[in-house]
Amino acid sequence: MADEDIEHAIDNVMSIDDQDDDTRLYIGSARNADLLEVVTIVRDDGSELVIHAMKMRPKYRRLLPGD
């Protein structure tokens, strides 16, 4: 997956789900409009590091607005 698609998904986020383990799940669109799931770890200084990115799985559809 291209870094540009991951950045696009985070910049054009449709849903953010903060997890209990200092990770954050973003649901957003790639440049071609495919929905992606992107997981970041939130560092102590507030910056984030992407640790997972792939096409959104159906189990996350519930996080989308209107679903």
What are these regions (language model features)?
Residues 1-67:
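Ribonuclease/tRNase effector modules and their secretory precursors
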